[in-house]
């Protein structure tokens, strides 16, 4: 093999909106409410190995806005990417998939969610930046804690999945 073939390689093959749903269970009455909505945001990351060097990474986001006890809207979206990653040492592969890939995908997710909320007739909600490294490290610590509590249990990747 030549040196070029052994060089670390990272390529974004595709970025795509995998899934999105929007519910407005209390429309149109909710538009008459004067109170400011409370907003809850949840974000998750999953990864699957599709081939030897090809990974699908999915960043999921759920935004729920409520006025008093009534749901104004609920939006769920999954932004995905297919990444070709080769010649990366195993100890660097999981952080690359769990930190770098979600960092690339999140701006697309944030934009799609803001656009859908606006098109639904609500003021835009701009999701704050996420420190995926801190999220990754937090999950890694949780996995290590669980592994210590249940010695001998198989470990998954900190991004919530086991890479096969």
Swiss-Prot record:
One Pfam family linked to the record: SecB
Main location: cytoplasm
UniProt KW Cytoplasm keyword: yes
Record-linked InterPro entries: SecB, SecB-like_sf
Keywords: Chaperone, Cytoplasm, Protein transport, Translocation, Transport
Domain of life: Bacteria
GO terms (BP aspect): protein folding; protein tetramerization; protein transport
UniProt subcellular location: Cytoplasm
GO molecular function terms attached to this record: unfolded protein binding
GO CC term (a single one): cytoplasm
SUPFAM superfamilies noted in UniProt: SecB-like (SSF54611)
Subunit-level organization: Homotetramer, a dimer of dimers. One homotetramer interacts with 1 SecA dimer.
Family matches, as PANTHER family: PROTEIN-EXPORT PROTEIN SECB (PTHR36918:SF1), PTHR36918
Similarity-based family: Belongs to the SecB family.
Functional description taken from the UniProt entry: One of the proteins required for the normal export of preproteins out of the cell cytoplasm. It is a molecular chaperone that binds to a subset of precursor proteins, maintaining them in a translocation-competent state. It also specifically binds to its receptor SecA.
Identification of the protein by name: Protein-export protein SecB
Highest classification ranks of the organism: Bacteria, Pseudomonadati, Pseudomonadota, Betaproteobacteria, Burkholderiales
Gene of this entry: secB
């Amino acid at each position: 093999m030549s040196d070029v073939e052994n060089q670390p390689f990272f390529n974004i093959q595709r970025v795509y909106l995998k899934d999105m749903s929007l519910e407005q269970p209390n429309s149109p009455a909710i538009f008459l409410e004067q109170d400011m909505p409370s907003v809850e945001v949840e974000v998750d990351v999953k990864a699957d190995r599709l081939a030897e060097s090809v990974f699908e990474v999915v960043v999921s986001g759920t935004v729920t806005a409520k006025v008093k006890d009534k749901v104004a809207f609920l939006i769920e979206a999954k932004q995905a990417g297919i990444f070709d990653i080769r010649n990366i040492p195993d100890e660097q592969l999981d952080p690359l998939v769990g930190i770098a890939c979600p960092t690339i995908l999140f701006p697309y997710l944030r934009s799609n969610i803001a656009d859908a909320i606006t098109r639904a007739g609500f003021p835009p909600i701009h999701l704050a930046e996420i420190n995926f490294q801190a999220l990754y490290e937090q999950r890694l610590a949780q996995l290590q804690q669980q592994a210590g509590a249940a010695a001998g249990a198989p470990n998954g990747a900190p991004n919530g999945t086991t890479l096969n």
